[in-house]
Amino acid sequence: FIKTLSTTTTPEGTRIDSYTQTRNYYLKVDYTTPVGKGGSFEVGGKADFNNNVIPNSYFNLSNNDWVFDNTKSNNFKYSDNINALYANFSKTFFEKLETRIGLRYEYIRFKLRQDVGNIEKTTSYGRFLPNLLVKYSFNSNYDLSLTYNHNLWRPWYSEFNPFLMPNNDGIYTQGNMDLLPNPSDRVVLKFGLFKKYFISARYMFTDQDYWTNYKEEDGKMISFPDNFKGKVEKFYLFANTNQNFLKNKLNVNFGLGWYYIDNSDFNIRNGLSRDNNYISYIGGSTNLSYTNLFN
């Protein structure tokens, strides 16, 4: 959409102090046992507890002194409990074919609370997250692998914070207490040569995501993360190499890939421009590192 944005900046003489207080506790248990010839079974669990507070203190400049404004200040509190159980079974056949199948279940219960207005929300949900690996080694120099993962991306706790934060460009930012997690599926086919060169084809898709949206309230333009439905598919062809030189002192990593993204369903369902329904581009990356310890 097209929107004319105000260029009015936050008035001078306003100060906001915002920081985070974070506590994390967890308990993790893992157990692995061999199963037959070339097989193993792994099971485990983890209980994770998080407690986060974001105080937002608003001050006005009066007679060269900063005066605390209780009417605009706020404390945002986020706490969660994530419990996870997983099981993996791995087995190698005739010393060439490696397989692994796994299943993970995660259950999260989190609570959001804003002191101003005494706004409180509690949400819980559970998800199964399967994964699969099949890898065949033709010999010591060539191997082919196929992996599948179902993942879940959760919003960062600060993205739920509904406190209205002014920016210098005149636009305010605000969190969204109704954000949803973003599930995705990924399949990767990878061919390795001499343990130095790799060629991979990747496919990933998701049916929902959250992106920046805009709204206008009381003459203020506000940006906030919002939920968007719609399928996005991504296809990658990628080649990279990772090598060491000069007696392992110099490490070189170089990659080059072709990327294709299908946004057509996402754009149609959200009323966005169809000019970017299909995007393709070539991208590359390189990394050089040299280590010379006392030599």
PLM features: residue spans?
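Primarily recognizes Gram-negative and organellar outer-membrane beta-barrels
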Residues: 1-193, 197-295
